[in-house]
């Protein structure tokens, strides 16, 4: 019988996606080289997979303070439309991995990819995530989860130390798309 410990948790699908065999979630892999952040609300970010792209959770007040308003910031509009092949100038839009049901992960889903044996968390340097995910900014990444106690805030995971916190939805953070569910 094969050694279960030797089985990989993550499978690179060869199409810019990674499947987590433990949770059955499929994740977007980022591209490029970690560098200076790019605020996609002030410039066009045509490559949604660029590791340096920052997005807003909501477009601003009053949407950010009303829990009943749907998320309408660049993370949920421009980013997801591009990942899902819905926003392009040519009319032939590639969707990621052949799927068009990508979304921003919940807090619980995003926390599943924090790896406390990697990067700063493991005593080294870099982000606390398995290198199989490709380049990752060691900073805050949005989840789709609103802070129930403070509706103007949403939950983020910081891959510099692996922790979660909530912050103002009008701020910018990084985003990694996911599909499926557990």
Report each predicted region and the residues it spans.
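Glycine-aromatic-enriched surface loops/turns that form tight recognition elements
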Residues: 1-103, 107-182
């Amino acid at each position: 019988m094969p050694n279960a410990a030797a089985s990989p948790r993550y499978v690179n699908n060869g199409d810019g996606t990674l499947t987590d065999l433990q949770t059955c979630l499929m994740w977007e892999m980022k591209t490029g080289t970690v560098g200076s952040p790019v605020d996609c609300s002030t410039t066009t970010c045509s490559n949604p997979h660029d590791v340096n792209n920052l997005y807003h959770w909501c477009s601003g007040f009053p949407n950010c303070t009303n829990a009943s308003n749907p998320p309408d910031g660049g993370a949920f509009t421009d980013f997801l439309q591009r990942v899902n092949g819905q926003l392009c100038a040519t009319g032939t839009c590639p969707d990621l991995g052949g799927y068009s049901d990508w979304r921003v992960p919940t807090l619980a889903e995003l926390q599943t990819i924090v790896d406390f044996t990697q990067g700063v968390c493991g005593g080294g340097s870099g982000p606390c995530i398995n290198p199989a995910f490709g380049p990752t900014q060691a900073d805050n990444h949005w989840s789709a989860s609103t802070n129930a106690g403070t509706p103007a805030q949403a939950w983020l995971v910081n891959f510099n130390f692996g922790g979660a916190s909530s912050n103002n939805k009008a701020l910018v953070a990084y985003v990694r798309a996911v599909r499926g569910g557990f």
